[in-house]
């Protein structure tokens, strides 16, 4: 009997000690590491569900409206929430216009060439500024930072580009926005955190700066490089303001964004439309379906490219924000 009481007492003491240890562990953890309560889990689910709805519902409406007939759009009151009278007429008419096909090729060319040029300049500049013994790197860095807060202005930029013969030339759509100081600073911050042991080992093996950049720095910075390239590519793909400044007359040189903007203006009865075959036939389609088709057409390339860089996006953004 005494042995049974002793064993039971020991078990109770162990339970009490374990409970006290759990309480101490919980009290030592920060609040954000505490297991969520039922109310917290419900609030998290509602927040995530609401955020997802805010993102997906507009996309759903845009896609359905772009495929809807004028009657379906009128019955829905302007924006289609459920499939009704779907048609691809708007897309057929838009893609049958040679202006759109040419503009798509122009946009792809500008995006590819511009992104390659911007990445080359940004990587070289960031690597040079990241080396502490680079000649004049502090002065160059100061000049770059100043340009983030003080710009020359629209009219001086226009006069410089046109004075260099850039009016109605493709390079005028690339060079004025070829370099982003923010992207250079992000790359520089990452390059500064590259292992000094790796660089020293490469120098001992006889590698110069070009070899170190190509064989050591770039392979260890794929994430931030992919994110920076994505930022540049999206900027070139969505750009249309420079077209309004430097290439406003020749529609055969317009990129896709500006051509589609003129189609939206035509659908709304605004001036500045493209003089092409699409203009005479689009009256058979709903203007709103045309505008939604414009949005879908401009999103498709980004949706195709994003999965290839998605795995690097989170790592690259956080790395550029934390390091340095």
Regions found by a protein language model. Name each.
Residues 2-324:
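A hydrophobic, multi-pass inner-membrane permease signature
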């Amino acid at each position: 009997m005494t042995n049974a009481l002793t064993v039971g007492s020991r078990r109770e003491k162990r339970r009490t000690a374990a409970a006290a240890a759990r309480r101490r562990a919980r009290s030592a953890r920060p609040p954000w590491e505490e297991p969520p309560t039922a109310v917290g889990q419900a609030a998290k689910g509602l927040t995530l569900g609401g955020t997802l709805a805010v993102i997906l519902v507009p996309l759903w409406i845009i896609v359905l409206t772009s495929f809807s007939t004028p009657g379906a759009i009128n019955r829905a009151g302007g924006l289609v929430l459920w499939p009704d009278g779907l048609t691809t007429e708007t897309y057929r008419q838009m893609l049958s216009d040679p202006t759109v096909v040419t503009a798509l090729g122009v946009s792809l060319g500008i995006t590819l060439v511009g992104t390659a040029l911007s990445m080359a300049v940004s990587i070289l500049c960031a690597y040079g500024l990241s080396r502490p013994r680079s000649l004049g790197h502090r002065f160059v860095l100061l000049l770059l930072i100043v340009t983030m807060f003080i710009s020359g202005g629209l009219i001086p930029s226009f006069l410089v580009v046109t004075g260099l013969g850039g009016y109605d030339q493709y390079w005028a759509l690339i060079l004025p926005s070829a370099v982003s100081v923010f992207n250079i600073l992000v790359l520089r911050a990452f390059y500064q955190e590259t292992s000094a042991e790796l660089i020293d080992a490469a120098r001992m093996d006889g590698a110069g700066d070009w070899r170190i950049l190509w064989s050591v720095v770039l392979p260890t910075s794929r994430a931030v490089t992919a994110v920076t390239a994505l930022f540049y590519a999206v900027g070139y793909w969505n750009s249309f303001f420079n077209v309004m400044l430097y290439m406003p007359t020749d529609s055969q040189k317009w990129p896709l964004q500006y051509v589609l903007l003129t189609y939206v203006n035509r659908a709304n009865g605004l001036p500045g439309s493209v003089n092409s075959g699409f203009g005479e036939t689009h009256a058979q389609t709903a203007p709103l379906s045309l505008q939604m088709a414009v949005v879908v057409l401009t999103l498709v390339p980004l949706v195709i490219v994003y999965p290839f860089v998605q795995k690097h996006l989170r790592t690259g953004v956080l790395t550029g924000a934390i390091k340095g």
